[in-house]
Amino acid sequence: MEHKDIPDAQLHQIKGAASASSGQVPIATGSGTTVFGFLDWTQVANKPTSSGYQAKLSAFSSVNQNPSAVDTPLQITFGSAQTTADVSISAAGVITFNTSGNYLIDIFLRFGRSTSAGNAILLNRILKNGAQILNSNGVILSAATQTIPFSAAIPLTMAAGDTITMEVARDSAGTNDGGLFVVSPTIAGWNIVPSATVVVNKFVDGA
């Protein structure tokens, strides 16, 4: 009878199986024998990988950002300077890409106004290497102490050395009021609501 034809009930178990614990597997020793043990992740030679976006930098501003006058853009800042291998940001809000690739830029802005009568028209835009990309974004605030949050996820292909900046402006068709506002919770243990936040993600191919 060939070995392949032996019924399962008559087959011998692998040597060492009788004393192995539940969940242990046979592991080759490299010397022609096997032992039973729990497989450690470090022992896996061909580990599975995954592709997708990974966060490379996150920054936010904890101060209000108000243009000085109508039709006078203000460059948006995101707190202190930071540097990573793939991307860096200056205290002036200039995002510099240190490596080329496909990026996803998440931005969160909180438009607001505090005083004055009439409608306040607030605009913002994104610039790549100093030139505007995409359409402008805007809100009209008709009441004092009004705030409106805005967020967007923007996919961009960037080369090493490319920069991204953002601006906010008060349009002269409206009143000279408003900008990006911070909200400070009075509830103990709650973090502030920043005036502006940016998260830079890079696509990583795990293949």
Predicted segments, located by residue:
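Disulfide-braced loops of extracellular cysteine-rich modules
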Residues: 11-22
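Small-residue hinge/turn detector
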Residues: 25-28
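Short, disulfide-bonded extracellular cysteine-rich repeat modules
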Residues: 33-37
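Short acidic, low-complexity intrinsically disordered linear motifs used
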Residues: 38-47
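Extracellular jelly-roll beta-sandwich "head" domains, especially the C-terminal globular C1q domain
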Residues: 52-207
